[in-house]
């Protein structure tokens, strides 16, 4: 009886261990199923081991006599020799507490190692960082304000003027400019705050279009267009530009050149070059009805009177009457030029 009891106890313990072994394999199977694509071979081995263990358990329950063989087969076929190469098998119940403690101890060691590594990294980082700047602070760039005078003139381009020295630089600079004597009370006040506005104005001046340089060939086309249109007082800038057919030429440029040309044509003719012995004030005369009168441009206070010369002898009186009826222009050609003597 004692033999049977001892045999029953061994059989029940072995069956219990086999059930625990199957449960551990099932837990591992659940873990591996998450990584089914990455670990297909492991999953297949675990499933085969679980099936073989269950098969042996069912056979051993039917045949009580072969319990020793079942235990040996289950341990050999399902045994951990195959799985110890892949992963450690987790035993349940009694050994679970020990494994949990071991895992907690490993986790604490890992945490302490990570903290130590983090402290080392922080210390290395603090050593590598430079806490002060060796280079001195840059000096502030103090730009003096610039003053630009604004004048109302007809010129298209105004050059920059040099800065005038001022007594107080901190006070705002205000420059008031009066335009011309014709305007009574109108004045323009221009205040420039700093170098920023000066740079903007300088950039705007540099971005301006360069003035047109009228070459002799371009001026010749201009004169040819004026001749076709009937003169400078009749032609318009747009018509002149269309006739000239020059790339890049604008109406404003043609208009400016036309105004200059009109002013040039209105000027009187330049006086004849004088020698050293002549009077520095050139005397100009004009003829009116056969009488010579000095022009208004002369600044001399003398009075001139014509001195008649002896006319040529004519044969008939009809020629005299015809000659007297001629215009001053024709009479000046036929008669002798009278000599002028200054009267004081």
From Swiss-Prot:
PROSITE patterns: HTH_MYB. Keywords: DNA-binding, Nucleus, Transcription, Transcription regulation. Residues 206-266 form the HTH myb-type domain. It is found in: Nucleus. It holds the Pfam family Myb_DNA-binding. It comes from the Eukaryota. Residues 90-122, 156-212, 306-344 are annotated as: Disordered. One of its GO terms (molecular function) is DNA-binding transcription factor activity. Residues 237-262 bind DNA. Residues 310-319 have a biased composition (Polar residues). Transmembrane segments: none annotated. GO terms for biological process: cellular response to hypoxia; cellular response to phosphate starvation; regulation of DNA-templated transcription. Residues 178-188, 330-344 have a biased composition (Low complexity). One of its GO terms (cellular component) is nucleus. InterPro entries: Homeodomain-like_sf, HRS1-like, Myb_dom, Myb_dom_plants, SANT/Myb. Residues 97-106 have a biased composition (Acidic residues). PANTHER family: MYB FAMILY TRANSCRIPTION FACTOR, TRANSCRIPTION FACTOR HHO3. Probable transcription factor involved in phosphate signaling in roots. This is Transcription factor HHO3.
């Amino acid at each position: 009886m004692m033999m049977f009891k001892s045999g029953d106890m061994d059989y029940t313990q072995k069956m219990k261990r086999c059930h625990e072994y199957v449960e551990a394999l099932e837990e591992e199977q659940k873990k591996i199923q998450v990584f089914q694509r990455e670990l297909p071979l492991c999953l297949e081995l675990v499933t085969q081991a679980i099936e073989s263990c269950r098969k042996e358990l069912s056979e051993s329950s039917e045949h009580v006599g072969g319990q020793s063989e079942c235990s040996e087969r289950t341990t050999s076929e399902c045994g951990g020799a195959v799985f110890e190469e892949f992963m450690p098998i987790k035993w349940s119940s009694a050994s679970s507490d020990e494994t949990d403690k071991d895992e907690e101890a490993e986790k604490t060691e890992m945490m302490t190692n990570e903290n130590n590594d983090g402290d080392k990294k922080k210390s290395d980082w603090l050593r590598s960082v430079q806490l002060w700047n060796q280079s001195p602070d840059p000096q502030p760039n103090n730009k003096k304000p610039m003053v630009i005078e604004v004048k109302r003139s007809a010129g298209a381009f105004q050059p920059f003027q040099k800065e005038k020295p001022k007594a107080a630089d901190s006070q705002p600079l205000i420059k008031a400019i009066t335009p011309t004597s014709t305007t009574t009370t109108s004045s323009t006040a221009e205040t420039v705050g700093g170098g920023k506005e000066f740079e903007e104005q300088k950039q705007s001046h540099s971005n301006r279009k360069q003035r047109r340089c009228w070459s002799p060939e371009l001026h010749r086309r201009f004169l040819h267009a004026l001749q076709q249109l009937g003169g400078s007082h009749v032609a318009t800038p747009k018509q002149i530009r269309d006739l000239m057919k020059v790339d890049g030429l604008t109406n404003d440029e043609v208009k400016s050149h036309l105004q200059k040309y009109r002013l040039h044509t209105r000027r009187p003719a330049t006086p004849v070059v004088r020698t050293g012995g002549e009077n520095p004030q050139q005397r100009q005369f004009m003829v009116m009805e056969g009488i010579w009168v000095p022009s208004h441009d002369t600044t001399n206070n003398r009075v001139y009177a014509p001195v008649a010369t002896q006319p040529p002898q004519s044969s008939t009186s009809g020629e005299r009457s015809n000659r007297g009826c001629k215009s001053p222009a024709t009479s000046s050609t036929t008669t002798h030029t009278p000599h002028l003597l200054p009267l004081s």
